[in-house]
UniProtKB/Swiss-Prot annotation:
Enzyme class: transferase
Keywords: ATP-binding, Magnesium, Nucleotide-binding, Transferase, tRNA processing
Source organism of this protein record: Pseudomonas savastanoi pv. phaseolicola (strain 1448A / Race 6) (Pseudomonas syringae pv. phaseolicola (strain 1448A / Race 6))
CC cofactor: Mg(2+)
Coiled-coil parts of chain: none
This protein's name: tRNA dimethylallyltransferase
């Protein structure tokens, strides 16, 4: 019997069928589901994220879905903290945490840990907010561009939360947020290479995807078309009508949302929006495969197989997760 409690990772590219398999597993195992998806954390973003339906979530609850407003930011460190808390609660009930999703950075952060970012400093933050009031947010963004051009390129001038945090990190530590993240990545990669795990669980790693990449591309295109038929444009229109969201926010930069937003801005025709949305989703899947190829002890399942549940259960039994 393992000294550490069990956990299951169910990973894979977008449109591979992860959610359906996770639900099937939860029907026959003492599992509770935790979402590992950087877009599903946002409320009001249902169609474009292929979020499980309200009926599915009512019957098979997922932790870490609909926990944030789209105006907020969410980091890998935030996820790790939230996921560890959820896993501890699930384990305390005698159940198995089943983490399902495609945000591979989150899985890696959970498994191998992250170096700590500098803590918030109230005095520094107050000074930055005062500067913003006096000189405007663009002035702070210009400051960030000097000390951390990489962060400045990805943070919109109208995203005060992330802008202040990036400048705060630099002023408190003397290192840019980009440098800290590079350090985190290096330490996490070193931990992975050496087999050092920072997660107090015995983890079984499952991945699901079509064996033929062309099939995945077809599924991605079909799903994007279905999203449009289901009212994806209306969903983004509702987000725009709030007046406090913009294209620089992490939520709006999510695959699909960015392209629809640009279409509604008049930058893309509908056909261009659809084509670019599908291409962006395929590029996301390619990045996910790149992460998965380097993942150790990964058991693959074919999305098109009819017996994935029994195959998954057989594997979980073979690695003593179910003992």
């Amino acid at each position: 019997m393992n000294a550490l409690p069990p956990a299951i990772f169910l990973m894979g590219p977008t449109a591979a069928g992860k959610t359906d398999l996770a639900i099937e597993l939860s029907k026959v195992l003492p599992c509770e589901l935790i979402s590992v998806d950087s877009a599903l954390v946002y409320r009001g973003m249902d169609i474009g994220t292929a979020k499980p339906s309200k009926a599915q979530l009512a019957e098979y609850p997922h932790r870490l879905i609909d926990i944030l407003d789209p105006a907020q930011s969410y980091s890998a460190a935030d996820f790790r903290s939230d996921a560890l808390a959820a896993m501890a609660e699930i384990t305390a009930r005698g159940n198995i945490p089943l983490l399902v999703g495609g945000t591979m950075l989150y899985f890696k952060a959970l498994l191998h840990g992250l170096a700590d970012m500098p803590a918030a400093d109230a005095q520094v933050r107050a000074q930055l907010e005062a500067d913003a009031q006096a000189y405007g947010w663009q002035s702070l963004h210009d400051q960030l561009a000097v000390v951390d051009p990489v962060s400045a390129a990805r943070i919109h001038p109208n995203d005060p939360q992330r802008l202040i945090r990036a400048l705060e990190v630099y002023r408190v530590s003397g290192m840019s947020m980009t440098a800290h993240r590079e350090q985190q990545t290096a330490q996490s990669t070193e931990a992975a290479a050496s087999g050092r795990q920072q997660l107090p669980y015995t983890v079984a790693n499952l991945a699901i995807a079509p064996a033929d990449r062309k099939v995945l591309h077809q599924r991605i295109a079909l799903r994007f078309e279905q999203m449009l038929d289901q009212g994806f444009l209306d969903e983004v229109l509702a987000l725009r009508s709030r007046g406090d969201l913009h294209s620089g926010l992490p939520s709006i930069r999510a695959v699909g949302y960015r392209q629809v937003w640009d279409h509604l801005d008049g930058k893309l025709t509908r056909d261009e929006m659809q084509e670019r949305g599908i291409i962006a989703t395929r590029q996301l899947a390619k990045r996910q495969f790149t992460w998965l190829r380097s993942w150790e002890d990964l058991h693959w399942l074919d999305s098109l197989a009819s017996d994935n549940l029994s195959r998954a259960l057989k594997y979980l039994g073979s690695v003593s997760i179910l003992s």
